[in-house]
């Protein structure tokens, strides 16, 4: 009897046994169509065996035509992810095969490489970087100041790999970043790269998967899920803005796409290049211990000057009511506009105001399903929870004490900054970019096009605007609240604040005119600002690493979070306490249980247990044993987060 264990792209499923028809020859990695419940699915031949313990075995229908199969390297990646992130194989297979590709033949357009393309001249510093990269045999970080030409360096590497007939993957934390890179890519290489993200249609994704499996697709630019594409001939993986938290998936399988891509590069024997002006602490540590190599660019392309950074002490400002721009920043904006230069105002807070409260009883309007405040959105006349999406009308009276005309709004969001900017500069063309105002890559591309063509004078944006955009006529950046996020009770709060301020400041002065960045702060003596102002990231990283080491926290240790959630807070807390009580205490440090920073999310109360262990300790083996000691009731949802990035 010939049996094939078939891995189906179905969540929480392990390989299932199927009979192999007599006339069918199969190899591990082949794609086959099998009956599953009341439908047919495409699955991966995971293992070939001679017997089965299953009482009833169905038969494989057919092998997928066109010699489409999954390489042994991708199969190894699936196994590694299942083991490391403690997830079922079927859930990971769903990332590799997100939809059925065994339907009728799809015409796949082959990417034709134009061999006559001419890459621009590199500076001497960039040439040295390319030489080092060509000789490197380990993951390499290209660390350069904002505007130093990191993209041009990996474009030269792409050219080399295309000449060898290899496939290339360029990963971006947000596909919104892709617009400018795609345009530059087409200029350089004469063909359009494939884009892979959540907005690509199902039909187009099928075509892309067929193209990758048949080696007709050579270059893909994609978000985190692109690392699972079934490349057959992968030669280069570029991870741009490698420090970005968007590489960590916080729902479904909790994985870090940057780290997983590096593992994939090992399996595929592909070169790994990481790029960032503000690399993650983990990457800096990996360089220090010799695991990664470093290439540094200290000059901006064409030796353009870095912007000056000024700290504005907001405790000395006498702001009028509903005003959030300091006099110094307003005067700087006026001067910039008079000189026909563009302005970026940055506030990492969506909506009009983050809080509405009652002046009579002090009640704060919170989400009925979460422990978060409801955000005021004036444009839509709604209150919205930015965590679960719940919306309600804007109340005219307090829902708690029922008093009329006692509700007031507190603090600014970008809609409020837009309102103030329009009042101050009525003749200027002002635009806003955030998840609310640019909900699609097409809308983002439109705004970027307007900015590049000087159709916008003042751009007001959230974190989305900090990621690698190049506007040569932008010479002034104003950070409305530089304190936001720096005082969070979070291991990475200082790191994130430094990276964010450095990145947003790097948008200024990338053309012929020198830029200036104003940071508005009520805590101007914050040491982070001194590092940002001096551009001294090396000292910042050294200090941050010393703090982490003394606290025995990553990257000097391993961590995992066990997250318990359910509709009864008392029952969830009881289970969490029982888990900690029975947990083996040798070789690990256990913190908690503690309420998550977001203690209630989508109607579920949430508690966390944090496990800290030595770098060489097998944390996954420990967690499996620990979880085997207790039965978790069905009303309690348990998630394991290996290498957690946040504790919300």
From Swiss-Prot:
Residues at which Zn(2+) 1 binds: 358, 361, 398, 401
Q: What class of enzyme is it?
A: isomerase
Enumerate the Gene3D superfamilies for this protein. Answer: P-loop containing nucleotide triphosphate hydrolases, PriA, 3(prime) DNA-binding domain
What cofactor does its activity depend on?
Answer: Zn(2+)
Task: Tell me which EC number(s) this protein carries.
Answer: 5.6.2.4
What's a single GO BP term from this record?
A: DNA recombination
Zinc recorded as keyword? yes
User: Cross-referenced SUPFAM superfamilies, in alphabetical order?
Assistant: P-loop containing nucleoside triphosphate hydrolases
User: What does the record say about how the cofactor binds?
Assistant: Binds 2 zinc ions per subunit.
**One Pfam family, short name:** DEAD
Q: Which SMART domains match?
A: DEXDc, HELICc
Q: What PROSITE patterns has UniProt attached to this entry?
A: HELICASE_ATP_BIND_1, HELICASE_CTER
Q: Where is the Helicase C-terminal domain?
A: 393-548
> What's the subunit arrangement here?
Component of the replication restart primosome.
Give the family this protein belongs to, as stated in its UniProt record: Belongs to the helicase family. PriA subfamily.
- This protein is called Replication restart protein PriA
Which ranges belong to the motif DEAH box? 240-243
Residues engaged in binding ATP = 144-151
The protein's matches in HAMAP family, at most eight in alphabetical order, are given as: PriA
Q: Name one GO cellular component term.
A: primosome complex
State the organism of origin: Rickettsia conorii (strain ATCC VR-613 / Malish 7)
GO terms of molecular function: 3'-5' DNA helicase activity; ATP binding; ATP hydrolysis activity; DNA binding; zinc ion binding
Record's catalysed reaction(s): Couples ATP hydrolysis with the unwinding of duplex DNA by translocating in the 3'-5' direction; ATP + H2O = ADP + phosphate + H(+)
UniProt keyword annotations, A-Z: ATP-binding, DNA replication, DNA-binding, Helicase, Hydrolase, Isomerase, Metal-binding, Nucleotide-binding, Primosome, Zinc
Biological role: Initiates the restart of stalled replication forks, which reloads the replicative helicase on sites other than the origin of replication. Recognizes and binds to abandoned replication forks and remodels them to uncover a helicase loading site. Promotes assembly of the primosome at these replication forks.
- Annotated Helicase ATP-binding domain residues: 131-297
Q: What positions does the entry give for Zn(2+) 2 binding?
A: 367, 370, 385, 388
> Gene name?
priA
């Amino acid at each position: 009897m010939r049996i094939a264990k078939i891995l189906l792209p179905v969540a929480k499923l392990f390989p299932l046994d199927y009979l192999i028809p007599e006339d069918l020859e199969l190899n591990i990695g082949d794609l086959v169509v099998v009956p599953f419940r009341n439908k047919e699915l495409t699955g991966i031949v995971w293992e070939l065996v001679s017997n089965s313990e299953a009482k009833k075995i169905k038969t494989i229908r057919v092998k997928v035509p066109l010699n489409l199969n999954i390489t042994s390297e991708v199969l190894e990646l699936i196994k590694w992810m299942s083991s490391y992130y403690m997830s079922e194989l079927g859930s990971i297979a769903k990332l590799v095969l997100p939809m059925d590709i065994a339907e009728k033949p799809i015409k796949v357009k082959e990417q034709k490489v134009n061999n006559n393309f001419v890459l621009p001249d590199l500076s001497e510093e960039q040439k040295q970087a390319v030489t080092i990269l060509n000789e490197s045999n380990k993951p390499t970080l290209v660390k350069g100041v904002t505007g130093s030409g990191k993209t041009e360096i990996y474009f030269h590497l792409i050219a080399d790999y295309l000449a060898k007939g290899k496939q290339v993957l360029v990963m971006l934390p947000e596909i919104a970043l892709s617009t400018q890179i795609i345009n530059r890519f087409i200029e350089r290489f004469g063909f359009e790269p494939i884009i892979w993200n959540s907005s690509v249609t199902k039909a187009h994704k099928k075509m892309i998967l067929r193209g990758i499996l048949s080696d007709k697709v050579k270059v893909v630019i994609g978000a985190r899920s692109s690392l699972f594409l079934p490349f057959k001939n992968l030669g280069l993986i570029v991870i741009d803005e490698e420090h970005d938290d968007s590489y960590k998936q916080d729902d479904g399988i909790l994985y870090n796409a940057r780290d997983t891509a590096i593992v994939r590069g090992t399996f595929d024997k592909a070169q790994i290049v990481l790029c960032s002006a503000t690399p993650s602490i983990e990457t800096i540590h990996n360089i220090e211990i010799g695991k990664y190599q470093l290439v540094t660019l200290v000059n901006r392309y064409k030796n353009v000057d870095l912007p000056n950074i000024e700290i504005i002490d907001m405790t000395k400002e006498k702001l009028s009511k509903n005003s959030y721009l300091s006099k110094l920043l307003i005067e700087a904006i006026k001067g910039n506009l008079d000189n026909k230069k563009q302005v970026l105002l940055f506030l990492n807070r969506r909506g009009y105001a983050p809080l509405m409260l009652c002046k009579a009883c002090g009640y704060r309007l919170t989400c009925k399903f979460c422990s978060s405040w409801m955000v005021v959105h004036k444009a839509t006349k709604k209150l919205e929870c930015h965590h679960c999406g719940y919306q309600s009308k804007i109340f005219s009276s307090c829902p708690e004490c029922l008093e009329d005309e006692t509700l007031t709004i507190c603090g600014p969001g970008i809609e409020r900054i837009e309102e103030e900017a329009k009042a101050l500069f009525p003749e200027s063309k002002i635009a806003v970019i955030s998840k609310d105002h640019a909900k699609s890559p097409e809308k983002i591309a439109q705004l970027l096009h307007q900015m590049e063509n000087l159709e916008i004078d003042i751009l007001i944006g959230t974190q989305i605007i900090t990621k690698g955009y190049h506007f040569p006529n932008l010479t002034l950046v104003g950070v409305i609240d530089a304190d936001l996020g720096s005082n969070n009770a979070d291991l990475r709060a200082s790191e994130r604040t430094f990276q964010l301020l450095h990145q947003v400041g790097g948008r200024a002065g990338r053309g012929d005119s020198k830029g200036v960045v104003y940071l508005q702060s009520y805590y101007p003596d914050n040491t982070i600002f001194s590092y940002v102002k001096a551009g001294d990231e090396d000292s910042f990283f050294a200090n941050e690493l010393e703090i982490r080491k003394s606290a025995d926290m990553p990257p000097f240790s391993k961590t995992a979070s066990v997250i318990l959630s359910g509709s009864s807070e008392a029952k969830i807390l009881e289970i969490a306490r029982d888990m900690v009580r029975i947990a083996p205490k040798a070789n690990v440090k256990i913190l908690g249980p503690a309420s998550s920073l977001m203690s209630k999310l989508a109607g579920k109360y949430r508690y966390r247990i944090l496990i800290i262990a030595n770098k060489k300790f097998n944390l996954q083996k420990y967690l499996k044993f620990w979880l085997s000691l207790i039965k978790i009731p069905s009303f309690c949802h348990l998630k394991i987060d290996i290498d957690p990035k946040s504790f919300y």
